[in-house]
Amino acid sequence: MAAAVLRAALQDWRSCLGRSYGRRKLSQTQGPPDNPGFVESVDEYQFVERLLPPTKIPEPPKHKHYPTPSGWQPPRDPLPSLPYFVRRSRMHNIPVYKEITHGNRQMTLIRKVEGDIWALQKDVEEFLSPLLGKTPITQVNEVTGTLRIKGYFDEQLKAWLLEKGF
């Protein structure tokens, strides 16, 4: 008796699943709606383009003399034939940065180094040794292409890299 009641309850429950609550099926004979959808207008797209960010940073304009009033200078046209290369940042600047960690540890960071980063480390140590009076403490990360130097030497290293032609 209980099994028969349970079976009947399950059949009623399954029949309810077949129905979709709150939705109705459209008949096959019904045609497309009279709504045309959307109209594409090319005339106003110029206003949309103004809102979209540019996909690439534009090349800097040509100037009559360098460095510019802001101090920017382009890389030398024939690139230096060194075993390493320091690529410019996306804003066309030399990627040398100041970094402070742990509240008082001052570091200078050279990023975007391609090629023999160990040769760059050796050249940087030779350049900074007379300024410091000792060999600077450096850290090389070959995977990320970065060179860290203990202390703030960003202005000296930027001038040195510009002099080398990067």
Curated annotation (Swiss-Prot):
- GO biological-process terms attached to the record: mitochondrial translation
**How does the annotation summarize its subunit structure?**
Component of the mitochondrial ribosome large subunit (39S) which comprises a 16S rRNA and about 50 distinct proteins. Interacts with OXA1L.
Q: Does the keyword Transferase apply?
A: no
Pfam families with a match to the protein in the record: Img2
Coiled coil residues, start to end: none
**Where primarily located?**
mitochondrion
- What's the name of the protein? Large ribosomal subunit protein mL49
InterPro entries xref list: Ribosomal_mL49
GO CC aspect terms: mitochondrial inner membrane; mitochondrial large ribosomal subunit; mitochondrial ribosome; mitochondrion
Which keywords are on file for this protein? Mitochondrion, Ribonucleoprotein, Ribosomal protein
What family does this belong to?
Answer: Belongs to the mitochondrion-specific ribosomal protein mL49 family.
Record GO terms (molecular function) = structural constituent of ribosome
**Which source organism does the UniProt entry give?**
Mus musculus
Say yes or no: keyword Ribonucleoprotein present.
yes
